[in-house]
């Protein structure tokens, strides 16, 4: 079993740092979108493209593991080093899917109500406020 080179450890560390930065960049937007359901200013194409990019990064990491294990026999140590990167990419893909789902749902509901997305979001927010007021008045 060959020892893992310092270059490979540095490469994986940089990849993990980039994954964590992306994770913390998307987390506030995802939490805000879940809380407010407001996706009017967001484009669905951005989240789909980001999802595909992260999927490609994940596949690249998996293929790297397979190649290194096959050719250089690093075994589980390489897998253990790249696992955090794969987990971060998986969480990032999940965050993208959550926002994309809320966006698609808002666009769909807006079309049902024959509104644009901005009008529907205002309408839905007004409905929530009415419900809160009626609950307080009871």
UniProtKB/Swiss-Prot annotation:
This is Uncharacterized protein UU042. It is a multi-pass membrane protein. It is found in: Cell membrane. One of its GO terms (cellular component) is plasma membrane. Its main location: membrane. The chain crosses the membrane at residues 8-28, 47-67, 82-102. To U.parvum UU007, UU008 and UU041. Keywords: Cell membrane, Membrane, Transmembrane, Transmembrane helix. Gene3D superfamilies: 1.20.1280.290. The keyword Cell membrane applies.
């Amino acid at each position: 079993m060959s020892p893992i080179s310092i270059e490979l450890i540095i490469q994986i560390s940089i990849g993990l740092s980039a994954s964590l930065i992306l994770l913390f960049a998307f987390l506030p937007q995802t939490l805000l979108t879940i809380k407010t359901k407001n996706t009017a200013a967001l484009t669905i194409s951005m989240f789909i493209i980001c999802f595909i990019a992260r999927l490609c990064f994940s596949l690249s990491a998996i293929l790297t593991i397979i190649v290194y294990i096959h050719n250089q026999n690093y075994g589980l140590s390489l897998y253990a080093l790249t696992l955090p990167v794969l987990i971060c990419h998986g969480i990032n893909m999940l965050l993208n899917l959550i926002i994309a789902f809320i966006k698609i749902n808002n666009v769909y509901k807006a079309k049902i109500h024959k509104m644009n997305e901005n009008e529907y979001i205002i309408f839905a927010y007004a409905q929530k406020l009415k419900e809160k007021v009626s609950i307080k008045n009871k």
